[in-house]
Swiss-Prot record:
It comes from Vibrio cholerae serotype O1 (strain ATCC 39315 / El Tor Inaba N16961). Pfam families: BNR_2, Sial-lect-inser. This is Sialidase. GO terms for biological process: ganglioside catabolic process; oligosaccharide catabolic process. Substrate binds at R224, R635, R712. GO terms for cellular component: cytoplasm; extracellular region; intracellular membrane-bounded organelle; membrane. The gene is nanH. Induction: May be controlled by sialic acid availability and a growth-phase-dependent mechanism. The active site is at D250 (proton acceptor), E619, Y740 (nucleophile).
Length: 781
């Protein structure tokens, strides 16, 4: 069988000095007028004619076509598939597309039979000259076209979907004509097109016919964790990624080595170039593992930027074996679509991985106090580098034996960063821009012995001067100060200086990166811990991880204050030390510099003084809504019930500021997806836009077997036509093992899916979204 599209692509890639491999089960005949391949036989098809049936190349309409002349005999062309190809078609579906016109008669039959069954549409011109279709095993005819349109060229499509009740849908010029067509019994084993009857004459001209089997393998198990993006500037260029798992395990096991691999297609996912290892150049001695490739396609530069995590080879996120002092981090590589070149990996760990001492005053208070010998008759200065994560009562205090100065930091209801100063009634708004509210800031107190006042500076900018309050205390303290008010703060530095001498110095940024041999316990370092109720404190973060799936480039931020169109952003998994959460990592300059947003707001409840009941969002994906909001869907690992509320295996969150902060969408969890697997697994979400500008969301996840039960089987596809409020479907895409998946728009009609299937083999599905959509919208009418 000649794979015409494969050969064309191979020739093009050879011109660029690139290798290619033929994966796609795509069988076609194309009447190009090429003298070398001008007949079906020369393109690999078997002639199956009887009596006077024949075929000939014609240019009668000014374009080449193969004229099927079933006059006085059958005139059809066939190709027989292998057992493996039949099995693949049964498990992953197939699509048959024909561009032809019927000139006279009937019994024009373009179909596929797998040895046990077939779906057989019969195209004819009826006695009134109308173009009609009927289906084997079903009654009635459907008129497709009348008048002169009946004998013009049209597109006929059959789309077969697998499942417990497999069926096909028939489309005419892109419109759904018949759904849920059940196969009929047949012993034939072939793809067939032409006039299929020796007793009924029929003449048709074929410009093109394609038969495509879904589910070609592009990465083989034990490799895992697929992701995929497609270029919108250079149509047809698709880049796929996975973890190369030599040894077969998750990262962080001595028994295996993990790297990041990629393959590229330049014909929409039909053929793929050879596998390329992106990380072996920075992993020559196999001392690290790399995981979770997260690509972002940037249309402004026509590049793909893929981020991935680095781990020590003996510890990673799973099992919380990774520790803050271990060499976890994030790297990225850039692929230039036009040239086909990859840049060397770039390390951005210092930009995105936080090193700090973290205090969560959730249900209690936790302060650290250090007695000092400040002299109120001399100037002094304190510096603190702090990030306010949430809540209030987050405090810095300096007392010099005469007066004390207290700065209490909080996030107010509007999301702004606010300071309250002791002895001053009015709060001070320090920052209202969300991107800066949740960042680390330098808080400096400068005491004037002459005036007995202190001036507050934030990031070097003078904010105010105040007198504080009379106090005989002589100390410095920080933490969450009120057991009745929740708050979380992260500290990187505390320094107290007088007369050029550091009286107190706490370098949490440094200590968070040190091994246990270095003393880090604040109480052993001279601090007094003052704790009430339930709190949590730790050095972190242990790890940051891009997670599986693709990231996005923002394009709909016109309605958002501080428009950030062009922002590259993805949801990353962060492990503080004990719990997983998700935060956005983003770049506003094409990837040169990266910042982090806040973590997802999650409910919690202390079950005891040492057991915190909360959610742990992990693998997540996001999509930009039409109004500029970002919708994030996250897998919930481990616990799913907090304070009696079942949040299910999946929860959605919303951002109204370009991914900086998030809100939990009540009751918007896995339950909005009917017949979804109850197991935890990575999913995928994306936006799809048609050529007419209409748009909707797509979501893929296993359904389970049967649907709605626990298990990684039977990948489903859901549609949302109201920006993620409700979801229609699922449409089953895979029959059998289905784990992680990623879906991305390929063109104005199709999306491409990569999914883990049997034995972790990662397969490609090229799905006709505009056709499948009609299966749902038709049922609503």
């Amino acid at each position: 069988m000649r794979f015409k599209n494969v050969k064309k692509t191979a020739l093009m890639l050879a011109m660029f000095g690139m290798a290619t491999s033929s994966n796609a089960a795509l069988f076609d005949y194309n009447a190009t007028g090429d003298t070398e391949f001008d007949s079906p036989a020369k393109q690999g098809w078997m002639q199956d004619n009887t009596n006077n049936g024949s075929g000939v190349l014609t240019n009668a309409d000014g374009m080449p076509a193969w004229l099927v002349q079933g006059i006085g005999g059958r005139a059809q062309w066939t190709y027989s598939l292998s057992t493996n190809q039949h099995a693949q078609a049964s498990s992953f579906g197939w699509r048959m597309t024909t561009e032809m016109k019927v000139l006279s008669g009937g019994m024009i039959t373009n179909y596929y039979a797998n040895g046990t069954q077939r779906v057989l549409p019969i195209i004819s011109l009826d006695s009134s000259g109308n173009l009609v279709v009927e289906f084997e095993g079903q009654t009635g005819r459907t008129v497709l076209a009348t008048g002169t349109a009946a004998t013009e060229y049209h597109k006929f499509e059959l789309v077969f979907l697998p499942g417990s009740n497999p069926s096909a849908s028939f489309y005419f010029d892109g419109k759904l004509i018949r759904d849920n067509i059940q196969p009929t019994a047949s012993k034939q084993n072939m793809i067939v097109w032409g006039n299929g009857s020796s007793n009924t004459d029929g003449v048709a001209a074929y410009r093109d016919i394609k038969f495509e089997i879904q589910g070609d393998v592009i990465f083989r198990g034990p490799d895992r964790i697929p992701s995929i993006v497609a270029s919108s500037v250079t149509p047809g260029v698709v880049t796929a990624f996975a973890e190369k798992r030599v040894g077969g395990g998750d990262p962080g096991a001595l028994s295996n080595t993990n790297d990041i691999i990629t393959r590229t297609s330049r014909d929409g996912g039909i053929t793929w170039d050879t596998e390329l290892n992106l990380t072996e150049q920075i992993n020559v001695s196999d001392e690290f593992d790399f995981s979770d490739p997260r690509p972002i396609y940037d249309p402004s530069s026509n590049t793909v930027l893929v981020s991935y995590a680095r781990w020590p080879t003996d510890a990673a996120q799973n099992g919380d074996r990774i520790k803050p002092w271990m060499p976890n981090g994030i790297f990225y590589s850039v692929y230039d679509v036009a040239s086909g070149n990859w840049q060397a990996p770039i390390d951005v760990t210092d930009q995105v991985k936080e090193r700090s001492f973290q205090i969560a005053g959730w249900g209690g208070s936790e302060l650290y106090r250090r007695n000092t010998s400040l002299n109120s008759q001399q100037d002094w200065q304190s510096n603190a580098k702090i990030r306010i994560v949430d809540g209030a009562a987050n405090q810095i205090q300096v007392a010099d034996g005469s007066r004390k100065y207290v700065v209490t930091l909080s996030i107010d209801e509007s999301g702004g960063l606010v300071a309250n100063l002791n002895g001053v009634s009015a709060p001070i708004i320090l920052q209202s821009e969300h991107a800066k509210v949740h960042s680390f800031h330098d808080y400096e107190l400068q005491y004037s012995a002459l005036n007995h006042t202190t001036t507050l500076f934030v990031d070097g900018q003078q904010i105010t001067t105040w007198a504080g309050e009379v106090s005989q205390e002589n100390n410095i303290q920080f933490g969450n100060a009120d057991a009745q008010i929740d708050g979380r703060l992260h500290v990187q530095k505390i320094v107290l200086t007088q007369q050029g001498h550091n009286l107190v110095e706490f370098d949490a940024f440094y200590l968070a990166q040190q091994t246990p041999e270095v003393e880090k316990d604040l109480e052993k370092l001279g601090w007094t811990k003052i704790k009430t109720g339930n709190t949590m404190s730790l050095y972190g973060n242990a790890s940051v991880n891009p997670g599986p799936g693709h990231g996005i480039t923002l394009t709909r931020q016109q309605n958002i204050s501080g428009s950030q169109n062009g922002r590259l952003i993805y949801p990353a998994i962060v492990l503080d030390r004990f719990f997983l959460n998700v935060m956005s990592i983003y770049s506003d300059d094409g990837g040169s510099n990266w910042q982090t947003g806040s973590t997802l707001p999650i409910p919690f409840r202390w079950k005891s003084s040492s057991i915190l009941e909360t959610l742990e969002p992990s693998e997540a994906d996001m999509v930009e809504l039409q109004n500029g909001d970002l919708l994030l869907t996250a897998r919930l690992d481990f616990n799913q019930i907090v304070n009696g509320v079942n949040y299910s295996p999946r929860q959605q969150f919303l951002s109204k500021d370009g991914g900086i902060t998030w809100s939990l969408l009540e009751a918007n969890n896995a339950n909005v997806f009917s017949n979804i697997s109850t197991g935890t697994v990575d999913a995928s979400i994306t936006r799809f836009e048609q050529s007419d500008g209409s748009h909707f969301l797509l979501f893929t996840n296993p359904q389970g077997n049967p649907a709605g039960t626990n298990g990684r089987q039977n990948l489903g596809l859901w549609f949302s036509f109201d920006e993620g409020v409700t979801w229609k479907g699922p449409i089953q895409l895979v029959n059998g093992a289905s784990a992680y998946s990623d879906i991305y728009q390929l063109d104005s009609e199709n999306a491409i899916v990569i999914v883990e299937t049997d034995n972790s083999n990662m397969r490609i599905l090229r799905m006709p979204i505009t056709l499948l959509k009609q299966k749902l919208t038709l049922s609503q009418n």
